[in-house]
């Protein structure tokens, strides 16, 4: 990926938001495609090809494309569909799985790609919701004390993991997941960098 990878900062809540967006995108494609739309909007610019797919940077900063949304040229010729969405909130990329007969390597850097306006979601759908201060948060924190009776929270109970064990009770487990969500960025497939694509992660589960 030419040195590009995920940013650990730059916005939170993308892990859960991206999955919700994927579900919405799939729901929109239950019906058969009815040909090109009346109008298309610029959605990205081509950066380079990756394993026969196009890697594009998002040029519509307030919109996120559906997964599997058709991608067009300006003349409404369909060239592929959105395959993956990658990166943090301030530097979003997406890949395009090519239609039969189309070659990602035939495009030039910064060539524009287009999408139907009906296949876009507002970026607010992927932003973290404000935390609500109150008794509920305190109750969840208190549950962490249950880890001690189970023997998982004590020092050295698992070969030196001590109180920092990631498996130390409901409170600890919830906290770990919350922290990971706050790192932000689209993370579709989970896990490391698949198929040799550098820092980018793959499809959603």
From Swiss-Prot:
Region annotation RGG-box 1: where it falls in the sequence: 4-28
GO MF entries: box H/ACA snoRNA binding
Location within or outside the cell: Nucleus, Nucleolus
Composition bias, Gly residues: 1-28, 142-197
Residues covered by region (RGG-box 2): 152-204
Keyword Ribonucleoprotein among record annotations: yes
Domain of life: Eukaryota
Its biological purpose: Non-catalytic component of the H/ACA small nucleolar ribonucleoprotein (H/ACA snoRNP), which catalyzes pseudouridylation of rRNA and is required for ribosome biogenesis. This involves the isomerization of uridine such that the ribose is subsequently attached to C5, instead of the normal N1. Pseudouridine ('psi') residues may serve to stabilize the conformation of rRNAs. The H/ACA snoRNP complex also mediates pseudouridylation of other types of RNAs. The H/ACA snoRNP complex mediates pseudouridylation at position 93 in U2 snRNA.
Protein name per Swiss-Prot or TrEMBL: H/ACA ribonucleoprotein complex subunit GAR1
């Amino acid at each position: 990926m030419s040195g590009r990878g995920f940013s650990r900062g730059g916005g939170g809540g993308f892990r859960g938001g991206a999955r919700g967006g994927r579900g919405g995108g799939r729901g929109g494609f239950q019906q058969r495609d009815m040909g090109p739309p009346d109008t298309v909007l610029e959605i990205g610019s081509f950066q380079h090809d990756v394993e026969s797919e196009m890697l594009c940077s998002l040029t519509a900063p307030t919109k996120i494309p559906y997964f599997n949304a058709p991608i067009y040229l300006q003349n409404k010729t369909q060239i592929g569909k959105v395959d993956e969405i990658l990166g943090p909130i301030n530097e979003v990329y997406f890949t395009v799985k090519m239609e039969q007969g189309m070659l990602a390597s035939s495009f030039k850097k910064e060539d524009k790609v287009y999408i139907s306006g009906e296949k876009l979601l507002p970026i607010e759908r992927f932003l973290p919701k404000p935390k609500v201060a109150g008794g509920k948060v305190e109750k969840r924190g208190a549950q962490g004390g249950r880890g001690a009776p189970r023997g998982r929270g004590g020092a050295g109970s698992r070969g030196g993991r001590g109180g920092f064990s990631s498996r130390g009770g409901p409170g600890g487990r919830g906290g770990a997941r919350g922290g990971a969500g706050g790192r932000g960025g689209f993370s579709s497939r989970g896990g490391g960098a698949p198929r040799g694509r550098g820092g980018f992660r793959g499809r959603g589960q």
